[in-house]
Swiss-Prot record:
Note: Pericardial organs release this peptide with 100 mm potassium in the presence of calcium.
Subcellular location, record wording: Secreted
Species classification: Eukaryota, Metazoa, Ecdysozoa, Arthropoda, Crustacea
Keyword terms, alphabetized: Amidation, Neuropeptide, Secreted
Any one Gene Ontology BP term: neuropeptide signaling pathway
Tagged with keyword Secreted: yes
Annotated protein name in UniProt: FMRFamide-like neuropeptide 3
Modified residues (Phenylalanine amide): F8
Organism: Homarus americanus (American lobster)
Aminoacyl-tRNA synthetase is among the record's keywords: no
Domain of life of the native organism: Eukaryota
Length: 8
């Protein structure tokens, strides 16, 4: 999901 980039 796009949540993968939310880690930043």
């Amino acid at each position: 999901s796009d949540r993968n980039f939310l880690r930043f």
